[in-house]
Each structure stands twice: as C-alpha cells, then as structure tokens.
C-alpha cells in the first residue's frame, strides 16, 4: 500500500514537471526562431553576419577587412527617393516665399523655411571613397550614445539630424540619442519636441538645462547622462551619410584610448545642398596657428606611409571640435572638458592636447562622412554667460588651454600673436595641472616633435614683437584699421577705440607687420591687408623710433597718410612730414 502511494506521488510530480517544462520548451523554440528571423532581417538590411559573437576577454578582437564584395554593413537594395532636396540636391522656395526665407535666415542663421519643405528622412549622395563600400567591420562594435546639444535650433533641422542617425545606423549599435537642451526659449522646442520624440519609444531622450550653460559644459553633462560604451557628439544641424557609424567605432573597439573624427561634408545654409568639402582623394588633418585658430593641412607622407589602404583612418593632431566619437569612460577619466572653459571655443584644442599628451590618439576616418550646416552667422549671443568673465571669452578659453598644456616657449608664441591675452583673468587652473601630473602626461614639445610636426611647415615659431598696440598717426591721431575686411583689402585710418581687435598692430623682430592672422603689405593701390605667406614670419617693414618712420625696405619708401583723402600709401621718406610719422601705443584692456 505504502509502495503504491509513493509511486503515485512520483507520477504526479513528473506530470506536473512536464506541464511546466513543455510551455517553456515551446517558448524557447519560438524565441530561437524569432532570433534567427531578426538576424536574417538584419542581414537583409545591412548585409551583416547572421549571428553575433560575444566579445571574449583575452581573445584578439576582430579588425576591419577589405573584401571583394560589399561590406557587411553596407545597405542593400536602397530604393531611390524623389522630392525636395532628395539625394542632397539644392532646394529653392517659390518666389512668393522669399520673405519667409529671409525671416528664417535672420532668426536662425540658416533657411529654416527651406528646411521645412525637405523630408526628415531625405537621402543624401554617398560622398565616400569607392573603397569604403568594401570593408567588413566586427559585428559586436560598442553600443553608442549619440549626444546632440542644441539651443534655439530650427525644429526640422534638429529632427533631420536625429532621423538621419536612426535611419543610417545599425540598430544594435545605437544605444540611445540624447538631446540636451541648453535652455532654449522657443516653444516648439519644449512641449512639441517632447511629444515628437515619443514615437521613438525611449531611444531618443531629452534633457534640459535649468539655465544657459554653453556648448562645452552642456556636452559634458550629456556625457555624464549617457549610458552607452561610446559617446558620439554631433552638432544639432547635421546629416550622417551612408554607413557612417561602424568605421567610426572600429578604431575605438581596437583601442579605447582612440578618439575618432568623421570627415565633414558641407550643407548649404540657404538651399540645403549636400556637397563634399574636400576632394575625393585628398586627405586633410587638423592643425593650428599660434593665435589658436583652427587650420587644416594635407596629410604628410609620413602619416600616409602608416596605412596600407587609402580609405583607412589616419592620425591627426587636433580636430574642429563639433563631431567625434570617444569611449565614454575614457572621456571621463580625462576629466571630460575643462569645466573652466565657457560657452565654446578652445575645447577642441584642450581635448586634443590632453588626449595626445596623456597617452591617447586621434584618428580621422575617411569612410565616415557627416554633413554639417555652416550658418551664415551666429543668431544668438552668449547672454549672461558673457558677464561671468571680463574680456573676450574665447581668448580666455585659449589662455586656459595654453597655460595648461603648452611649454614656456610655445606659450610665448601665443602671447606674441595675442599680446592682450597676458592681461586676461583665466581663473584657477590648478585642477587641470594636477590632472596633467596625475596622468603623467608628456610635454608639448613631444607633441610637436612626434604628432604635430607639420604645424611648423606652415606656421613657424614667431619672433618676438618689437612694437605692438595701436599704430597712431602723428598728424591726425587716427589709428591704422583693418576695417573688419577680409584680405585682400585696403586698410584705412579711423578713430582710435582702444579695444584692440582690428586696430591691434604688431611689428616683429623679422619685419612682419601684422593684424590678427593677417599681414600688412603695400603696392601701388596703397596699404593693404593680405594673407601672410605660409611658412614665413618675416616682412619688409622697419620702424625708426627717432624719426617715427615706418619704412618698406624693398620699396625704400615710408608709410604715409594723404592729408586730403586720408588714404594710406607709400611715399618718399621725408623726416619733416608729420603725415609720414607713426607711433605705437601699447594698450591695456578696458575689462
């Protein structure tokens, strides 16, 4: 009897287990089939492998491979689209809407009325090298947070940026898009934006500053909020191109201390035509001149020889600042951006120098292309942020950067180019210097010798200034002025305002007379503002403090002011002519 009871109990328990297990086995089988269908759908869309492989620690990571056919993330069977602006073509509004175009350009610095007639999902021409279409990339590249900072951006331009990222990124790599609102006051960027992003079901998040912080600090906040392994920063007026993300992530997958930069295409701010900025086979990289203006130079042969293929990434000393990818944890280990930098300007150099000098590297990626709208003008000012510092904010930022990362010799080049910067209060940089010491960072001389060696080819070290300040006429007491013109342009004499800028003139020990990054030259037309000859720091000018003559040594004539016309020219030197006499007045900031 007892044996029969035990057997009956075992049979009941077995039946109960089967009742529980059978549904689980059914669900597992269906999940496996669903997973297979997802992989096949992914393979159809992107040409990628059918099964993902988890990363294994200690196992060498896959590297990109050049293949005969299309690369694994290249889109297949893309149907052509028709409509305004499709394929990146220019779009023009009808003549009766000209007033709308003009009004939106005044408000946004770009033609938002034109943008509003173009699809959020518009196609753009593939501007990549042909070779870029034939790279296979590792499937398990890091999941990415795309961070987009905006302030009073045109709604359609902002959302086209978002849609282009979603439409042209492998789904499993795009972790999230974070829109960081730097205290916008336009109504359509409040409730309308919040409602619009609901369609993305959590993929797109909006966070808002409670006061205006500026681009730099707002980006750092976005990095803090992000949860992806890699963060990609984009400006709020971009359109990413075909297969832009995998080539941007692959170098970081190989080495977490690499920062990658896409090649930037241009989008016209009036008609939204998408077009490449660079020639197809020409590669450029970011450098700088000693006033800390961003410049670009063709990639030197020394760098070209490091690569086997023309479409592979290459090293760059710096970058323009708006668009790049970096491992999130590494970015935070570097201290993110210097919190003492205000609004924008100089953050691209600060991050570049910090990365290179502290053990990382920067690579530009030819197979990653992103279009960027270059505004006609900046439609908003710095607001209350401008009152937080006395003096030009961007120059203050530059001073913080050079005082942290430059050696003494290179600091002098900056102060030679920007003499008034010596008198700016840059704030406390002790934390930045402590970070530099803690990370055991290399010297700036090392950076110039091994990474930015081509800077000297275009921008040699600057000789000291013999004289600087306002160049005043003895006869009229007016000041030499570039008049805000771009070279080539005739210079004039205007009221001395004491603020420097277009009236801040420098004469260096090699005879170069300069205003900002431009040089002062002379010909039959008069005294002209000209582009300085690259690779040179000398000039034809000589100042005699006794006679107050500024002589052109080639023409053997002196700078003169015409008494009647007030025009500037060269004349035969006459020690008794006060219209040929000049004096430099060093100025001090009125900050």
Curated annotation (Swiss-Prot):
Record-listed Mn(2+) binding positions: 235, 237, 372
Topology of this chain in the membrane: Single-pass type II membrane protein
This enzyme's EC code(s): 2.4.1.41
GO MF: carbohydrate binding; metal ion binding; polypeptide N-acetylgalactosaminyltransferase activity
Subcellular locations according to the entry: Golgi apparatus membrane
Bilayer-crossing regions: 12-29
Glycosylation site list: 30, 576
Cytoplasmic domain ranges by topology: 1-11
Stated role: Glycopeptide transferase involved in O-linked oligosaccharide biosynthesis, which catalyzes the transfer of an N-acetyl-D-galactosamine residue to an already glycosylated peptide. In contrast to other proteins of the family, it does not act as a peptide transferase that transfers GalNAc onto serine or threonine residue on the protein receptor, but instead requires the prior addition of a GalNAc on a peptide before adding additional GalNAc moieties. Some peptide transferase activity is however not excluded, considering that its appropriate peptide substrate may remain unidentified.
Name of the protein this chain belongs to: N-acetylgalactosaminyltransferase 7
Organism: Drosophila melanogaster (Fruit fly)
């Amino acid at each position: 009897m007892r044996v029969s009871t035990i057997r009956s109990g075992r049979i009941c328990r077995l039946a109960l287990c089967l009742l529980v297990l059978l549904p689980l086995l059914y669900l597992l089988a269906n999940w496996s089939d669903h997973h297979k269908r997802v992989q096949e759908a992914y393979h159809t869309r992107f040409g990628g492998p059918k099964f993902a492989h988890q990363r294994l620690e200690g196992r060498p990571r896959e590297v990109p491979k050049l293949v005969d056919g299309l690369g694994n993330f290249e889109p297949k069977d893309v149907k052509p689209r028709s409509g305004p602006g499709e394929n990146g073509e220019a779009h023009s509004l009808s003549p009766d809407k000209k007033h709308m175009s003009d009004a939106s350009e005044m408000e946004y610095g770009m033609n938002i009325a034109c943008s509003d007639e173009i699809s959020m999902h518009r196609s753009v021409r593939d501007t990549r090298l042909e070779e870029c279409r034939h790279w296979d990339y590792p499937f398990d590249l890091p999941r990415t947070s795309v961070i987009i900072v905006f302030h009073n951006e045109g709604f359609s331009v902002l959302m086209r940026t978002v849609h282009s990222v979603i439409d042209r990124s492998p789904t499993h790599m795009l972790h999230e898009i974070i829109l960081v609102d730097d205290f916008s006051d336009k109504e359509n960027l409040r409730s309308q934006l919040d409602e619009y992003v609901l369609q993305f079901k959590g993929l797109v998040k909006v966070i808002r500053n409670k006061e205006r912080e500026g681009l730099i600090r707002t980006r750092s906040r976005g990095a803090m909020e992000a949860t992806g392994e890699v963060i990609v920063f984009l400006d709020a007026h971009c359109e990413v191109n075909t297969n832009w993300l995998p080539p941007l992530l692959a170098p970081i997958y190989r080495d977490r201390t690499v920062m990658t930069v896409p090649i930037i295409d241009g989008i016209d701010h009036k008609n939204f035509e998408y077009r490449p900025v660079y020639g197809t086979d020409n590669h450029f990289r970011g450098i700088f001149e000693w006033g800390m203006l961003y410049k670009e130079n063709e990639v030197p042969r020394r760098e070209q020889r490091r690569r086997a293929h023309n479409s592979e990434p290459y090293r760059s000393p710096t970058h323009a600042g708006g668009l790049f990818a970096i491992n999130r944890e590494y970015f935070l280990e570097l201290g993110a951006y210097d919190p003492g930098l205000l609004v924008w300007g100089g953050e691209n150099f600060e991050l570049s120098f910090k990365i290179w000098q502290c053990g990382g590297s920067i690579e530009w990626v030819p197979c990653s292309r992103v279009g960027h709208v270059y505004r006609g003008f900046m439609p908003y000012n710095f607001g209350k942020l401008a009152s937080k510092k006395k003096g030009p904010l961007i120059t203050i930022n530059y001073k913080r950067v050079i005082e942290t990362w430059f050696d003494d010799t290179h600091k002098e080049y900056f102060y030679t180019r920007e003499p008034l910067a010596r008198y700016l209060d840059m704030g406390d940089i002790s934390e930045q210097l402590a970070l530099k010491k803690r990370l055991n960072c290399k010297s700036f001389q090392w950076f110039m010798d091994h990474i930015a060696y081509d800077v000297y080819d275009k921008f040699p070290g600057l000789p000291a200034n013999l004289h600087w300040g306002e160049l005043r006429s003895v006869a009229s007491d007016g000041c030499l002025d570039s008049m805000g013109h771009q070279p080539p342009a005739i210079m004039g004499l205007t009221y001395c305002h004491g603020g420097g800028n277009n009236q801040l003139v420098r004469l260096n020990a090699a005879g170069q007379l300069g205003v900002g990054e431009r040089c002062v030259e002379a010909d039959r037309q008069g005294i002209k503002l000209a582009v300085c000859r690259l690779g040179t720091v000398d000039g034809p000018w000589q100042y005699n403090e006794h006679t107050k003559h500024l002589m052109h040594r080639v023409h053997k004539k002196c700078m003169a002011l015409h008494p009647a016309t007030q025009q500037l020219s060269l004349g035969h030197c006459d020690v008794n002519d006060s219209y040929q006499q000049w004096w430099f007045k060093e100025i001090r900031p009125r900050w």
